[in-house]
């Protein structure tokens, strides 16, 4: 599914990753651990196509397609999801509208018809229920005024709705509240 070979990256002429090799097969779970500053978040960002990281050499293949040089949008359309270490707030954009736009965009890219509104609402409610989230949450701005744990729960919510082929969870435990630990 994912093959990384001899990946070397830098930011502003500072080497960050120096020869990373990793192979992930479908259904496998990998935990990448290391001290602060060892490049874990950099690896996640590179896999998601964030442009501030320059790939000096090496390859990243996802489902037999080279993804180095693809935009974050192109990578997400391939089915890679990144849960951020520090999720951003987007006041004024409701979670419901955001997720509808995401799913519509994905369906369009896959040449599939848009999900009917009734199916979308049903899926949103089911996902809320599975995470013990009040459906009022759907009208809130994305991460607007959310606690650290609520932000993480929101990202899990988004991941479940998008059903990616590969999920990269960066620092999933940072900022968690006690309620989030029950998920």
State where each predicted segment sits.
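ABC-family P-loop ATPase nucleotide-binding domains
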Residues: 88-165
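Walker B catalytic motif
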Residues: 168-172, 179
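The feature captures the beta-strand-to-loop junction immediately N-terminal to the Walker
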Residues: 33-35
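Short coil-to-beta microelement around the adenine-binding A-loop and adjacent beta1/P-loop entry
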Residues: 14-17, 74, 182
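ABC ATPase NBD Q-loop/coupling interface
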Residues: 59-75, 143
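Hydrophobic anchor residue at the start of the ABC signature
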Residues: 43, 155-156, 176
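Conserved structural motif at the start of ABC-family nucleotide-binding domains
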Residues: 2-4, 17
């Amino acid at each position: 599914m994912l093959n990384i070979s001899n990946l070397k990256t830098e930011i502003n002429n500072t080497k960050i990753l120096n020869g990373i090799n990793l192979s992930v097969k479908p259904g496998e779970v990998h935990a990448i651990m290391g001290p602060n500053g060892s490049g874990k978040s950099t690896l996640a960002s590179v896999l998601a196509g964030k442009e501030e990281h320059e790939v000096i050499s090496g390859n990243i293949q996802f489902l037999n397609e080279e993804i180095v040089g693809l935009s974050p949008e192109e990578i997400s359309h391939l089915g890679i999801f990144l849960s951020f270490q520090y999720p951003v707030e987007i006041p004024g954009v409701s979670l419901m509208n955001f997720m509808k736009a995401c799913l519509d965009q994905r369906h369009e890219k896959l040449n599939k018809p848009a999900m009917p509104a009734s199916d979308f609402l049903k899926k949103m409610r089911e996902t809320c229920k599975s995470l013990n989230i009040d459906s009022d949450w759907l009208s809130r701005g994305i991460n607007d005024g959310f606690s650290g744990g609520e932000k993480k729960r929101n990202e899990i919510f988004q991941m479940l709705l998008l059903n990616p082929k590969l999920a990269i969870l960066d620092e999933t435990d940072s900022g968690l509240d006690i309620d989030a630990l029950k998920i």
